[in-house]
C-alpha cells in the first residue's frame, strides 16, 4: 500500500528568461522556514505570509529586470511558485483538495477559497483604497495571482470583504491564502490513496 503521508512532497523549479532568473524550492510539509529574496521587499513580505501561516518551507531567489519596473519579477515569481506547488503535489492522491479561510487584520477581513482542481481560474475582488503601498503598485497582485493559479493548476477565489488600509487588505488576503492552501494540500488520512474527484483525476 502506498503511504502518502511518508512521501516527501518537495519540489525545486528553475525558470530563466531574458527578464528574470528564478529558483524556488518548496516543501509542502515544512515548518515555515526558508529564505525569500525576490528583489522586491514588499513581495517578500507577502510570500512570507504564505510560508509562515501555511507552514510551507519556501526558498526563492530571483534576479529580475528591476531597472525597468517590478512587473516581470512579481509575475514570474507567481508563475514559478505555482510550478513548484504543482510539482510538489504530484499525482494529488490523498489531498483534501479544497481549502478556505477568513483572515482578519485589524479592520481588514479577507476570504480565500482554493480548489486544487487542475483547472486554472482566478476570481479576485480586492477594492484597494490606494494605488500603491509604499512604492509597490497594487495592480501587480493580480499578475502574481494569475501566474500562480495558471501554473499551480488551481481555482482561486479571493475576496477582501472589509478594509480601509491597503497594506492590511492585501496582507489579510495572503494570510487567508496561506491557511486555505494549507488545508487544501493536507493529506486526508481517511482517503490517502484516492483522488478527491468523481472523475478519478485532478
From Swiss-Prot:
It catalyses: D-erythro-1-(imidazol-4-yl)glycerol 3-phosphate = 3-(imidazol-4-yl)-2-oxopropyl phosphate + H2O. This is Imidazoleglycerol-phosphate dehydratase. Its main location: cytoplasm. SUPFAM superfamilies: Ribosomal protein S5 domain 2-like. The keyword Lyase applies. Its EC number is 4.2.1.19. GO terms for biological process: L-histidine biosynthetic process. It comes from Acinetobacter baumannii (strain SDF). Belongs to the imidazoleglycerol-phosphate dehydratase family. PANTHER family: IMIDAZOLEGLYCEROL-PHOSPHATE DEHYDRATASE (PTHR23133:SF2), IMIDAZOLEGLYCEROL-PHOSPHATE DEHYDRATASE HIS7 (PTHR23133). The keyword Lyase applies. It is found in: Cytoplasm. One of its GO terms (cellular component) is cytoplasm. GO terms for molecular function: imidazoleglycerol-phosphate dehydratase activity. Pathway: Amino-acid biosynthesis; L-histidine biosynthesis; L-histidine from 5-phospho-alpha-D-ribose 1-diphosphate: step 6/9. Keywords: Amino-acid biosynthesis, Cytoplasm, Histidine biosynthesis, Lyase. NCBIfam families: PRK00951.1-1, PRK00951.1-5, PRK00951.2-1, PRK00951.2-4. It holds the Pfam family IGPD.
Amino acid at each position: 500500500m502506498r503511504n502518502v503521508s511518508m512521501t516527501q512532497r518537495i519540489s525545486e523549479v528553475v525558470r530563466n528568461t531574458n527578464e528574470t532568473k528564478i529558483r524556488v524550492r518548496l516543501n509542502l510539509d515544512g515548518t515555515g522556514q526558508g529564505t525569500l529574496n525576490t528583489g522586491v521587499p514588499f513581495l517578500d513580505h507577502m510570500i512570507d505570509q504564505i510560508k509562515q501561516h501555511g507552514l510551507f518551507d519556501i526558498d526563492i531567489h530571483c534576479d529580475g529586470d528591476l531597472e525597468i519596473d517590478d512587473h516581470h519579477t512579481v509575475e514570474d515569481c507567481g508563475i514559478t511558485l505555482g510550478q513548484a506547488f504543482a510539482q510538489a503535489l504530484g499525482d494529488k492522491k490523498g489531498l483534501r483538495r479544497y481549502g478556505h479561510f477568513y483572515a482578519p487584520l485589524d479592520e481588514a477581513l479577507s476570504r480565500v477559497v482554493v480548489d486544487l482542481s487542475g483547472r486554472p481560474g482566478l476570481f479576485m475582488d480586492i477594492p484597494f483604497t490606494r494605488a500603491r503601498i509604499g512604492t509597490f503598485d497594487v495592480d501587480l497582485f493580480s499578475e502574481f495571482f494569475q501566474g500562480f493559479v495558471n501554473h499551480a493548476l488551481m481555482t482561486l477565489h479571493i475576496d477582501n470583504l472589509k478594509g480601509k488600509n491597503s497594506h492590511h487588505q492585501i496582507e489579510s488576503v495572503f494570510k487567508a491564502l496561506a491557511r486555505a492552501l494549507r488545508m487544501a494540500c493536507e493529506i486526508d488520512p481517511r482517503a490517502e490513496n484516492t483522488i478527491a474527484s468523481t472523475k478519478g483525476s485532478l
